[in-house]
Amino acid sequence: SRKAKDQVLFVGAGDLERWAHAFAAWEKSDGDKHLAFSTYLTPRLSASTILLADEPLASKTTIGVGGSSKWYAEPANSEDLRSIVEACNLFGVQRSMIGRGSNLIIPDEGFGGLVIRLKGPYWKEISPRTEDTLVVGAGAKLKEICRFACERGFKGFEFLEGIPGTLGGALRMNAGAMG
């Protein structure tokens, strides 16, 4: 007969190790979703990734107002970003991305999930892949992309000049669209 604390886990196709670690984190947390999230995620991140709890967000916006986020992350690379998104999905933690914080108002009550910011050097990389292709990180500033492209003879980036923000933000907000 089952006791109140007994649990049964059925695993189908997929990554058994990931599910086993998630289940173990959940068991250790005694039902605390955020503790389970942290227990699962922390060992999967590189040392240079930032993961903070109850992080004030006002200083991360140009307006300088707003509350805290339950979780805040600055992943060092794409593998860490993938681990963060995976953990959010596994533990039902809502997530949101921010860029440089321009034109962003954070509610005073904050955000109960995880805020991700692509801030480190990995995300700011701009490099040529071929003679007519650039590889650009989502955190690269538009003015720096424009300058880099112009200095190396790339065409078609001129419209970025004068648009504030990063590539990720520009794509999200459809920057430069006319009408």
Predicted regions and their residues:
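Thr-Gly-centered strand-to-loop micro-motif
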Residues: 10-11, 136, 174
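ATP-dependent small-molecule kinase catalytic core of the GHMP/sugar-kinase superfamily
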Residues: 170-179
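Anion-binding (especially nucleotide phosphate/pyrophosphate-binding) glycine-rich loop
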Residues: 38-167, 171
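ATP-dependent carboxylate-amine ligase
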Residues: 1-35
